[in-house]
Amino acid sequence: MPKMKTHRASAKRFKKTANGGLKSASAYTSHRFHGKTKKQRRQLRGTRMMDSTTVKTYAKMLSNI
């Protein structure tokens, strides 16, 4: 049986945490900030944790990380 391959596009965007969760950067942060409030821009900084239902789907793609 062939080896499982890691989905490289996903591997560049997500990091696995020690407890098996996945974190990623926030979306909507590359441009068009003039339409966002200060609060929205502040809350978009940093990383986000993926919810548990989505983690199950992505865990298969990121099995070797």
Swiss-Prot record:
Which pairs of Cys residues are joined through disulfide bonds in the record? none
One GO CC term on file: cytosolic large ribosomal subunit
Disordered: region residues: 1-47
Q: Where is the composition biased (Basic residues)?
A: 1-16, 31-45
Q: Which GO terms describe its biological process?
A: translation
Checking InterPro entries in the record gives: Ribosomal_bL35, Ribosomal_bL35-like, Ribosomal_bL35_CS, Ribosomal_bL35_sf
Any single Pfam family the record assigns to this protein: Ribosomal_L35p
Taxonomically, the superkingdom here is Bacteria
Per its UniProt record, what HAMAP family does this chain match?
A: Ribosomal_bL35
Name-wise, this protein is Large ribosomal subunit protein bL35
Organism equals: Leuconostoc citreum (strain KM20)
